Design a protein with these regions (language model features):
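Conserved alphaE helix
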Residues: 137-148
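Juxta-kinase regulatory segment immediately upstream of eukaryotic protein kinase catalytic domains
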Residues: 1-40, 233-237
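C-lobe/activation-segment region of protein kinase-like
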Residues: 173-244
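Conserved ATP-binding subdomain of kinase catalytic cores across diverse folds
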Residues: 28-128, 147-152
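Conserved catalytic-loop position in the HRD/HxD motif
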Residues: 153, 158-159
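Activation-loop N-terminal segment of eukaryotic-like protein kinases
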Residues: 166-172
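Hydrophobic residue at the +6 position relative to the catalytic HRD Asp in the kinase catalytic loop
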Residues: 159, 163-166
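AlphaC helix of the protein kinase catalytic domain
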Residues: 129-135
Length: 244
């Protein structure tokens, strides 16, 4: 535990580092201290801030999660793992099962006896060749990658175009998942597996390619796969645009 300051309550920092990066712990903590003023912005949304920092001869990615609302400050302090902790644990699980994701370095949580505060997830910065959105021609390989997730009892709930990084490796492509805090680990039914493809695209021709590849991999009927995948995709699109 690292004690930060005293105002009303004593704030402390809980942290967990991967064994590989423990020797660089102090350097990483200095980067966290300078997070608000330094670093290269990678993305700044309404909820989270992502920055790139130099650590020795490599670049690392630090994601600062938005401080939760009053109720969730209590929930995350006592009852539920933080998004930072889940991201670290999920990344470790993926790495251990041969699934690509930027290597997890550490997570840190700031809290006091009553409330949860800031939290950070740190990983290697992966310089991707492209994202899923930019490479229609690799749909078949991506379909097989998603099937591999399911065979390892992994349900990536945020399986959407922006959360898959792609690197070219010779004549094939390697896939890396990011934004890992929403995952389940369980046996998946056929419908749950197919539904996991439903957020990836609204283009029928792409769904046809994924359905064809999925049918070849699993031995299931193409018509059965396509009818379910396209139906679930259309249902997701209706719900998505209804919210707008």
């Amino acid at each position: 535990m690292v004690f930060l300051s005293t105002k009303l309550y004593l704030w402390q920092m809980k942290m967990l580092f991967s064994e590989k990066y423990r020797p660089q712990k102090e350097e990483i903590l200095k980067l966290i201290d300078s997070f608000d003023k330094e670093g290269e912005n990678l993305g700044r949304g309404d909820r989270n801030v992502i920055k790139i920092f130099q650590l020795g001869d490599e670049k690392i990615n630090i994601k600062s999660f938005k401080v939760p609302n009053f109720i969730n400050k209590v929930v995350y302090n006592f009852f539920r793992k933080s998004k930072a902790a889940r991201s670290f644990e999920h990344a470790t699980y993926l790495i251990n099962h041969g699934i690509g994701t930027p290597y997890p370095i550490a997570y840190l949580e700031e809290n006091n006896p009553l409330f949860f505060g800031k939290s950070y997830y740190i990983s290697q910065q992966l310089e991707a060749d492209c994202t899923f959105r930019a490479l229609i021609e690799i749909l078949r390989e991506f379909t097989a990658f998603t099937h591999k997730l399911h065979e390892n009892n992994i349900l990536f709930k945020d399986h959407s175009p922006g959360n898959t990084l792609i690197k070219k490796n010779g004549n094939q492509f390697d896939f890396y998942l990011v934004d890992l805090n929403r995952m389940d680990f369980k046996n998946l039914s056929f419908e749950e597996r197919i539904k996991n493809y439903s957020r990836l695209t609204s283009k029928k021709e792409m769904v046809e390619i994924m359905s064809d590849e999925y049918a070849k991999i699993t031995g299931k009927s193409y018509d059965k796969v396509f009818d379910l995948m396209w139906g679930l995709t259309a249902e997701f699109q209706r719900k998505f645009y209804r919210k707008k």
